[in-house]
């Protein structure tokens, strides 16, 4: 087998929360809402450029979780541009952010939480200033 790279990740939640997640990942993280195949369940596919990277899938109330779903997820990271504008947008929305960096690389990391508490990293490789 040859691994060709990252395809997407999926978050599953009830519809009312799914709409909040969609708004967060579009308005805060900067993903774009895009086409989704006509599955029987409702949901959204969010894109970074031409690549679908986040699938939001409806879980019906009381629906059991699959056995392979684990509580070990820590965060997902997105490569981004526009650090200053992003920090201003997050501050204006009152979103709590932890700023960090990767030693020896110049990478700036912003860590935050989505409406369900999932970790999100916004990663910037651009020089500050």
Language-model segments: which ranges?
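Short acidic/glycine-enriched loop/turn segments that link adjacent beta-strands
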Residues: 39-43, 72, 104-108
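Short, conserved turn/kink motifs that form compact alpha/beta structural patches or helix kinks used as
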Residues: 53, 59-61
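N-terminal beta-strand motif that seeds the catalytic metal site of vicinal oxygen chelate
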Residues: 1-22, 74-76, 128-129
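Mid-chain, well-packed structural core segment of small domains
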Residues: 69-90
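Core segments of cupin and vicinal oxygen chelate
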Residues: 11-53
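Vicinal oxygen chelate
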Residues: 1-4, 92-129
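Short hydrophobic/aromatic beta-strand micro-patches
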Residues: 12, 77-81, 113
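Short amphipathic alpha-helices in soluble, non-transmembrane regions
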Residues: 23, 89-93
